[in-house]
């Protein structure tokens, strides 16, 4: 029986449309010859729309997006939009509305990829970052703004419900991986209230996963080990803020954000999950065919894996690995990279 994937496509700004086009090209190649088809719907969201209409993400947009199986996002933003407008009005609004409580960031050092590490080693881990709590919920404020007595605060929200569900997701992922190891990263010696909630939750849920080895690192120690011994990590679970910082460091040691894919996941599947490259819109090279679409292609692999199409996802990942090994220092256009990856996936 034929299966159809109803995919929302938000190409966005800058290089977004270019890399998304190549991601869709590889997606089509991965599904060719299968009983799975893709139906795409494009959405005009991002800086261009904000400049034209002042809108970021309307209730009508959310209602329409909610009907899809998944969302593929390119990149959002340009220098002409004030900081925070699109981040909060579009990306975070979408994350909270669709309860994307797992932010998934795989970090793998592919053979042939340049790294600042003296010794690369077998680096292959995933960060499971809580996505809907912490200090990003907007629970804070400021008074006496602009005076010498200004007071500003941001309150980090951590609920037992929210922490348990992301910890449970992380344990399930660790249990499904060969190494079966989970590392909690926090700072419970100083952030005693939230930190110990996370610690107790990991201990409680961990009892249900006896095959998964568990350890703990303070966040400052974790940054050291990410640079000196990243191969020690398998699955890392952490809160929203620490995860935001650690995942960019993880990208830096595994080839940069140009290779970094991500998924904003609703594991309950009550809403569509969203998949996107980590890099920005890079307006300085937009329209020039210089952008590397590899991170978008790897995001497509995450999308397929989330939808249960693991064989097709693995083919894309294998194609990327082979392409990276063989590309060397060759300079290729965005479309040429996409063509090469699509050809490898098609076999």
UniProtKB/Swiss-Prot annotation:
- Annotated positions binding Mg(2+): 220, 244, 248
Its cofactor is: Mg(2+); Mn(2+)
Q: Where does NAD(+) bind?
A: 280-292
Q: Where does substrate bind?
A: 95, 105, 129, 220
Q: Identify one Gene Ontology CC term for this UniProt entry.
A: cytoplasm
> What PROSITE patterns does this protein map onto?
IDH_IMDH
Q: Which SUPFAM superfamilies match?
A: Isocitrate/Isopropylmalate dehydrogenase-like
- UniProt xrefs under SMART domains: Iso_dh
The record's listing under InterPro entries reads: ICDH/IPMDH, IsoCit/isopropylmalate_DH_CS, IsoPropMal-DH-like_dom, LeuB_actb
Per UniProt, what is one Pfam family of this protein? Iso_dh
Locations listed in the record: Cytoplasm
The pathway entry for this protein reads as: Amino-acid biosynthesis; L-leucine biosynthesis; L-leucine from 3-methyl-2-oxobutanoate: step 3/4
Where does the entry annotate site (Important for catalysis)?
A: 136, 187
Output one GO BP term: L-leucine biosynthetic process
Q: What is its EC number?
A: 1.1.1.85
Keywords carried by this UniProt record: Amino-acid biosynthesis, Branched-chain amino acid biosynthesis, Cytoplasm, Leucine biosynthesis, Magnesium, Manganese, Metal-binding, NAD, Oxidoreductase
Tell whether Membrane is among the UniProt keywords.
no
| Subcellular location, principal | cytoplasm
Question: Record's superkingdom?
Answer: Bacteria
The reactions it catalyses are: (2R,3S)-3-isopropylmalate + NAD(+) = 4-methyl-2-oxopentanoate + CO2 + NADH
Give the enzyme's main class according to its UniProt record, as a single word: oxidoreductase
Q: What does this protein do?
A: Catalyzes the oxidation of 3-carboxy-2-hydroxy-4-methylpentanoate (3-isopropylmalate) to 3-carboxy-4-methyl-2-oxopentanoate. The product decarboxylates to 4-methyl-2 oxopentanoate.
Q: How does it assemble?
A: Homodimer.
Recorded hits in PANTHER family, A to Z, give: D-MALATE DEHYDROGENASE [DECARBOXYLATING]
Family the UniProt entry places it in: Belongs to the isocitrate and isopropylmalate dehydrogenases family. LeuB type 2 subfamily.
Supply the name of the protein: 3-isopropylmalate dehydrogenase
Organism per entry: Beutenbergia cavernae (strain ATCC BAA-8 / DSM 12333 / CCUG 43141 / JCM 11478 / NBRC 16432 / NCIMB 13614 / HKI 0122)
């Amino acid at each position: 029986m034929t299966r159809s994937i109803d995919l929302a496509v938000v190409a966005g700004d800058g290089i977004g449309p270019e890399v998304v086009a190549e991601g869709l090209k590889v997606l089509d190649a991965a599904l060719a010859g299968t009983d799975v088809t893709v139906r795409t719907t494009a959405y005009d969201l991002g800086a261009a729309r904000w400049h034209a209409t002042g809108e970021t993400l309307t209730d009508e947009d959310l209602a329409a997006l909610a009907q899809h199986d998944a969302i593929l996002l390119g990149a959002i933003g340009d220098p002409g939009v004030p900081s925070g407008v699109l981040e909060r009005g579009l990306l975070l609004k979408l994350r909270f509305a669709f309860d994307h409580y797992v932010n998934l960031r795989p970090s793998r050092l592919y053979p042939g990829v340049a790294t600042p590490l003296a010794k690369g080693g077998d680096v292959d881990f995933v960060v499971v970052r809580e996505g809907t709590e912490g200090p990003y919920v907007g629970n804070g404020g400021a008074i006496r703004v602009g005076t010498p007595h200004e007071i500003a605060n941001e309150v980090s929200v951590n609920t037992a419900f929210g922490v348990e569900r992301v910890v449970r997701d992380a344990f399930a992922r660790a249990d499904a991986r060969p190494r079966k190891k989970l590392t909690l990263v926090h700072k419970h010696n100083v952030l005693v209230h939230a930190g110990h909630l996370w610690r107790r939750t990991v201990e409680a849920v961990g009892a249900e996963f006896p095959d998964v080895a568990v350890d703990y690192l303070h966040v400052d120690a974790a940054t050291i080990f990410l640079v000196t011994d990243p191969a020690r990590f398998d699955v890392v679970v952490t809160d929203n803020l620490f995860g935001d910082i650690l995942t960019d460091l993880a990208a830096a040691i595994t080839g940069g954000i140009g290779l970094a894919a991500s998924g904003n996941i609703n594991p309950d599947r009550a809403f569509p999950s969203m998949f996107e490259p980590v890099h920005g819109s890079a307006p300085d090279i937009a329209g020039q065919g210089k952008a590397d679409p590899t991170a978008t292609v790897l995001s497509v692999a995450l999308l397929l894996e989330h939808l249960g199409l693991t064989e097709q996802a693995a083919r894309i990942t294998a194609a990327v690995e082979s392409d990276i090994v063989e590309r060397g220092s060759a300079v290729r256009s965005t479309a040429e990279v996409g063509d090469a990856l699509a050809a490898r996936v098609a076999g």
